């Protein structure tokens, strides 16, 4: 375990992804502390400029920011207090507060859907791979059906049927439609592990099937389930943003997708309110980059064939260090000459 943690902390992709994810988690947890305005209340004039734009335009009226980012003098006059870090929306809501509280919704949907997907995929995949027979046939048929049905159109249909779905409903819908691929991968790995000698030995000793699954099989699936979980979190966050942007989510909720939906309905880009669309897009981009880097790092550590040259050197150095710490059990060879 120490070797794995050392390799994880020595991986630049993993460190970068963890730092980005930790930043979003910090923002989501301490949202009431780092914001001064309510995200769902109008606390300013419509489309106030961000504070840094207002201050830069006042300090240097002939500068690049004043000429390119603060071109509307009327809006600049309404923003003279510079009270909003990232400006306001068409309804006068603080963009910074919406982004911070939107991180809560996005992470809730992402991790909630990820946990549900991993539970369903692991349970179904392990059951199909270990028990075989009719159980495998039925569960494999269900996997194939879910894989054949296009996921996004199915999501849109279910979300439209439900109506204005909240974050929890969207997480459940994503989980119901996204478990099949992970279950297929887990099933294939379970079929391979089932033929190992330690599984046969456990069966001969009379251990129950569920104990074998919990004690012998599941620990060998941690890397696959972990990578699948990170991928599901990323998929769920992006899917929630897409559904909310298309108007299939709850417009009263605070999320990055709802922010983009409000940008579309209020024609913010037509009036030059670039900050209203840029902020949630940057947030979605960075959370996607962080989770993707973390996913790549987990794959690299778990799968030797995906490791880079630097990764191979880290594994080689760790193996050599572990070999030095392990006492040698070999017996010295007899060098005494034999007389004929």
Language-model-detected regions and their locations in the chain:
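Short helix-capping/hinge motifs at transmembrane helix termini and TM-loop junctions
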Residues: 31-39, 129-133, 158-164, 177, ...
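Glycine-rich helix-loop "coupling/hinge" segments at transmembrane-helix boundaries
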Residues: 147, 160-162, 190, 231, ...
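Gly/Trp-centered helix-boundary motif
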Residues: 1-118, 122, 263-280, 284-294, ...
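Generic hydrophobic transmembrane alpha-helix motif, especially the helices
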Residues: 85, 106, 112-196, 224-226
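Transmembrane alpha-helices
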Residues: 104-120, 210-242
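Alpha-helical membrane-protein architecture signal
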Residues: 1-5, 88, 93-96, 100, ...
